[in-house]
Regions:
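Short beta-strand-plus-loop segments that form exposed binding edges in beta-rich domains
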Residues: 172-182
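Catalytic-core regions of hydrolytic enzymes
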Residues: 2-34, 198-284
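Short, surface-exposed beta-strand/strand-loop-strand elements in extracellular ectodomains
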Residues: 124-140
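Low-complexity, Gly/Ser/Thr/Pro- and Asn/Asp-enriched, turn/coil-prone segments
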Residues: 25-90, 180-198
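A short beta-strand element within beta-rich, extracytoplasmic domains
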Residues: 100-124
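Short beta-strands within extracellular/lumenal beta-sheet-rich domains
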Residues: 82-108
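Residue-level detector of conserved catalytic or cofactor/ligand-binding positions
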Residues: 285-291
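Extracellular carbohydrate recognition and processing domains
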Residues: 137-166
Length: 292
């Protein structure tokens, strides 16, 4: 908790204002509510697909995200419980208004700021410029996401203000418009940090996810078991410490900065850790006058 009080309000905004794209293995959103919109789990929120004359949404052969339970036990991975969808890309043309898209419209329990995370699967012909639009109270913000890397986990887009309820100015849209010939992939979209849902010792913490350790956030983010549970569930304290570096290594595996390790190919250039366990002690040193 102590280090998060520095990292979230100060360190991450400072780095982002300097132009960095920041990833943190712990939850970064202090919003206690969490709404997930997904094709596999219909609820009060809305997931919608619209095809074009040339392209139709299809289920991939790769497993995707699905939240089929409220609480997850050790080793359970929500990113292997569902499906993901894909569609052929189309280049933008002035006269072509027949673009295909997917929409995620959440039903939010309260007005406030929510982090927006998207997910997808990296496919053999994924494109590097998947176009996402986030509709929020401040307008519309566009993102180009490289789906050639980072598939099968949560990808943070930003934190935005949304109104309570379900409306057409609070949603995420993925278009099949691209400058490349290939496919874009759609899976779940998450709004808000939420509460911890990883069971340890037969119960959950009852805390907001941002107050929990990286071990539990990484499991919710679809990391492989060995990334967050090197001690096989027998020592969460040690696992939590190791999860932070293990997650970064897995995300960057296969990239130009970490070519020797298998992973998601995200080119993470630098890692930084803030420690709060430094201390000091009083030491008395006796220096005697040399004998002549």
């Amino acid at each position: 908790m102590f280090t998060q009080s520095f990292i979230l309000p100060y360190v991450i905004p400072m780095l982002e204002n300097a132009g960095a794209i920041v990833y943190t293995p712990r939850e970064r959103d202090t919003q206690k509510n969490e709404i997930i919109v997904d094709n596999d789990t219909p609820n009060a929120s809305l997931y919608l697909e619209v095809g074009s004359k040339k392209a139709r949404w299809t289920t991939t052969s790769v497993k995707g995200f699905a939240q089929k339970k409220a609480i997850y036990k050790d080793g359970e991975n929500p990113f292997t419980d569902g499906t993901s969808r894909y569609i052929q890309t189309e280049k933008k043309k002035k006269k072509n208004k027949d673009q295909a898209f997917a929409e995620w419209v959440p039903t939010l329990p309260a007005t406030g700021k929510y982090a927006v995370y998207v997910s997808y699967q990296t496919l053999p012909n994924s494109v590097s410029d998947a176009k996402y639009l986030v509709f929020h109270n401040g307008g519309v913000t566009e993102f180009k996401v490289n789906q050639k890397i980072g598939g099968g986990t949560w990808v943070y887009l930003g934190t935005f203000e949304f109104d309570k309820g379900n409306n057409d100015y609070g949603m995420v849209v993925l278009s099949n418009e691209s400058s490349e010939h290939g496919v874009v992939c759609a899976d779940a979209v998450r709004f808000g940090g939420g509460m911890g849902n990883i069971s340890r010792g037969g119960k959950i913490s009852g805390l907001p996810r941002y107050l929990e350790g990286a071990r539990y956030s990484s499991q919710w983010a679809g990391m492989p078991y060995d990334v967050y549970a090197g001690r096989k569930g027998e020592n969460d304290y040690t696992d939590d410490i190791n999860t932070r570096s293990n997650t970064i290594n897995y995300l960057s595996g296969g990239s130009v900065y970490n070519p020797g390790q298998t992973g998601l190919g995200v080119p993470l250039e630098m890692t930084m850790a803030l420690h709060s366990d430094a201390g000091c002690s009083l030491s008395l040193i006796h220096i005697s006058e040399p004998t002549r």
